[in-house]
Amino acid sequence: MTPQLHNELWTSWASLLRSYAAAHGLNAPQHAVVEVSPEHITLRVGSRWLRFTPIAVESSGSPEVDFALLEDGTVQIDDAAAEEMDVAAERFARELLLP
């Protein structure tokens, strides 16, 4: 993957996480904070958090697992089948905001 494509996908991933966190935050007791840098994206809700790097995702309650943004716009998490970025972002936001 080219660095330019990676940057575009990384920015899109952060945007999707922000959008779904905001949407789910409307019905949640707490709102999410999304912190973005070239090295990581962190989604925080109270004491719970998710942290994405270009190669892994970890959470406040689980061990680190493999993570990858793929060239076709899908997300690969650990050994699971790849899924569309928007579907994965919605699921992560929902699970963090509405446990």
Show where each model-derived region lies.
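Alpha-helix capping and helix-coil boundary motifs
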Residues: M1, L5, A28-P29, E83-E84
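Charge-rich, low-complexity N-terminal segments
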Residues: M1-L17
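Conserved short hydrophobic interaction patches
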Residues: S12, L16-A23, E95, P99
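Amphipathic, interaction-prone secondary-structure segments
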Residues: S19, H24-S62
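Intrinsically disordered, low-complexity regulatory segments enriched in Ser/Thr/Pro
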Residues: V45-V87
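Extended, compositionally biased alpha-helical segments that mediate assembly or anchoring
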Residues: V75-I77, A88-P99
